[in-house]
């Protein structure tokens, strides 16, 4: 179940607000310029689908975003617990960073935790299958896939070069709850 938990920048263990209601989550995030929507990830992709299979299954959703926002490229990120690079990838994504473009993800399988550092608060967004999130360019954030990752998401970019991060050097992510 998707969830949003909001923390103070100074109080990392006691949430200010929490909800699992998609409409409430969308309202809170939209007020901060973050797009959150529930879409339909209803295609049977089989076990550990190839990127091409995922793209073909959801080309209609990609086309909608491209027409709406002019995005230029897309790919698929899919990680499973047996990935030999899972620890290194988790460590990389757990470092607070920004992007020069929106970070758009449509989760078609599994889950991951986006943590957004907006002003003096941290918004932890548990994204699961059917969730679309778009983190605005320049928003400091990090992503937790958990110690046993199991997710597939379509990544959509303004930049044809794909995922390019500028790491902030702030260790704030270390202070907040993570996925098991």
Swiss-Prot record:
Print the organism lineage. Bacteria, Pseudomonadati, Pseudomonadota, Gammaproteobacteria, Enterobacterales
User: Which annotated residues bind Fe(2+)?
Assistant: 97, 99, 103, 141
Q: In which pathway does it act?
A: Amino-acid biosynthesis; L-methionine biosynthesis via salvage pathway; L-methionine from S-methyl-5-thio-alpha-D-ribose 1-phosphate: step 5/6
Species: Enterobacter sp. (strain 638)
> GO biological process: any one?
L-methionine salvage from S-adenosylmethionine
Q: Which major enzyme category is it?
A: oxidoreductase
Name of the gene this protein is made from = mtnD
- What name has this protein been given in UniProt? Acireductone dioxygenase
**Which PANTHER family does the entry link to?**
ACIREDUCTONE DIOXYGENASE
Question: What cofactor does this chain's UniProt record say it requires?
Answer: Fe(2+); Ni(2+)
According to UniProt, residues marked as the site described as Important to generate the dianion are: 105
Single GO term (MF) = acireductone dioxygenase (Ni2+-requiring) activity
- Disulfide-linked positions: none
Cross-referenced HAMAP family: Salvage_MtnD
Its biological purpose is as follows: Catalyzes 2 different reactions between oxygen and the acireductone 1,2-dihydroxy-3-keto-5-methylthiopentene (DHK-MTPene) depending upon the metal bound in the active site. Fe-containing acireductone dioxygenase (Fe-ARD) produces formate and 2-keto-4-methylthiobutyrate (KMTB), the alpha-ketoacid precursor of methionine in the methionine recycle pathway. Ni-containing acireductone dioxygenase (Ni-ARD) produces methylthiopropionate, carbon monoxide and formate, and does not lie on the methionine recycle pathway.
Q: Which Pfam families match?
A: ARD
How does the cofactor bind to this protein, according to its record?
Answer: Binds 1 Fe(2+) cation per monomer.
Q: Which family does it belong to?
A: Belongs to the acireductone dioxygenase (ARD) family.
EC number(s) of the enzyme? Answer: 1.13.11.54, 1.13.11.53
Q: Where is this site: May play a role in transmitting local conformational changes?
A: 102
Query: Which CDD domains does the record cross-reference, listed alphabetically?
Result: cupin_ARD
- Could you say which residues bind Ni(2+) here? 97, 99, 103, 141
Give the catalytic activity.
Answer: 1,2-dihydroxy-5-(methylsulfanyl)pent-1-en-3-one + O2 = 3-(methylsulfanyl)propanoate + CO + formate + 2 H(+); 1,2-dihydroxy-5-(methylsulfanyl)pent-1-en-3-one + O2 = 4-methylsulfanyl-2-oxobutanoate + formate + 2 H(+)
Gene3D superfamilies associated with the record: Jelly Rolls (2.60.120.10)
Instruction: Identify the keywords attached in UniProt to this record, alphabetized.
Output: Amino-acid biosynthesis, Dioxygenase, Iron, Metal-binding, Methionine biosynthesis, Nickel, Oxidoreductase
Going by the entry's taxonomy, the superkingdom of the source organism is recorded as Bacteria
Record-marked site positions (May play a role in metal incorporation in vivo): 96
Subunit notes for this chain? Monomer.
